[in-house]
């Protein structure tokens, strides 16, 4: 068999595979996603009552106000930064990850328990003292960071620990806030995989929706 014939066969095979893998397959997946799962395929975006996109159900956001259920700590601050001071281009490229600190690491212990210092700029408040100051029982999800730093969920236990504070600050009945927590809790996938989690963005938007109807 001549070299030209072998080369021609190789070129044809390459072109066929290229058309299948680079054109037919990806565009088929895009079409299937847009037809069957349009919300998920477009990023699971969440809008407010005005129709404005406020985030994604898959990406967490930092919530620290007493009026809201607070998010869990994040080593990347949920990939947020000051638009006027962003030398690492976090807002442009995004960033995720964990601290990977060992349980015995002093930096992790200081972040959790706090570290007083005569110089206020060097003092570390600590997650546990911050929670106790707000009359919130510390739970693992409110003290430790997640592996990605972008987790959109907190545990039902972490949400329940904040119910009284949120209800008090907003002047809402405790049972009404409890119902919101239950409604915004995602159960185990297929009933067996993973653990239940409360989607924080959905829950806090539901709180604002109540405030707008009062």
UniProtKB/Swiss-Prot annotation:
One MF term in the entry's GO annotations: ATP binding
A GO cellular-component term linked to this record: plasma membrane
Protein's UniProt keywords contain Repressor: no
Keywords linked to the UniProt accession: ATP-binding, Cell inner membrane, Cell membrane, Ion transport, Membrane, Nucleotide-binding, Potassium, Potassium transport, Transmembrane, Transmembrane helix, Transport
Transmembrane region(s): 17-37
Top-level taxon of the source organism: Bacteria
Membrane-topology descriptor: Single-pass membrane protein
Subcellular location as annotated: Cell inner membrane
Family to which this protein belongs: Belongs to the KdpC family.
Function comment: Part of the high-affinity ATP-driven potassium transport (or Kdp) system, which catalyzes the hydrolysis of ATP coupled with the electrogenic transport of potassium into the cytoplasm. This subunit acts as a catalytic chaperone that increases the ATP-binding affinity of the ATP-hydrolyzing subunit KdpB by the formation of a transient KdpB/KdpC/ATP ternary complex.
Subunit structure, interactors included: The system is composed of three essential subunits: KdpA, KdpB and KdpC.
Name under which the protein is recorded: Potassium-transporting ATPase KdpC subunit
Lineage of producing organism: Bacteria, Bacillati, Cyanobacteriota, Cyanophyceae, Oscillatoriophycideae
